[in-house]
């Protein structure tokens, strides 16, 4: 997979090198259209309920929650789990070796990302 995809140009480059999935820190209408037509699975970034709802309207059910440390950390994800029970998240941004297990313990978290892994 490839991360921090933020433009149609990057989506095309990712497609040309044969990636299996893409991750973006955010989403807008232009990127949504490009992701949807690329044929490559992707995880769009969200931070707010409005962004989650817009993604759900696209038929998406898995999102990157970014930056987690600035948008409510575990509290936000717990609340989103109650409001959006069918939605899954991969939180990134401020996740550490010390905190990642707390995130992974949540039912709506399928993975985490963090720079400590590098």
Q: At which residue positions do the language-model features occur?
A:
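Catalytic cores of alpha/beta
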Residues: 7-20, 50-58, 75, 81-82, ...
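Short acidic, glycine/proline-enriched helix-loop-strand junctions
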Residues: 38-42, 84-87
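Glycine-rich beta-strand-to-loop/alpha-helix junction loops that act as flexible
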Residues: 2-3, 91-95, 112-115
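A short pocket-lining beta-strand/turn micro-motif at the edge of beta-sheets
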Residues: 87-88, 108
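Catalytic beta/alpha-barrel core
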Residues: 1-6, 11, 18-27, 41-48, ...
């Amino acid at each position: 997979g490839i991360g921090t995809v933020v433009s149609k140009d990057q989506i095309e480059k990712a497609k040309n090198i044969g990636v299996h999935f893409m991750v973006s820190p955010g989403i807008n209408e232009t990127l949504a259209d490009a992701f949807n037509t690329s044929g490559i699975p992707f995880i769009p970034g969200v931070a707010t309920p409005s962004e989650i709802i817009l993604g759900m309207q696209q038929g998406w059910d898995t999102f990157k929650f970014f930056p987690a440390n600035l948008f409510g950390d575990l509290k936000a994800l717990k609340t989103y789990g109650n409001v959006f029970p069918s939605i899954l998240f991969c939180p990134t941004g401020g996740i550490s070796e010390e905190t990642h297990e707390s995130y992974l313990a949540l039912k709506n978290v399928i993975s985490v990302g963090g720079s400590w892994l590098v």
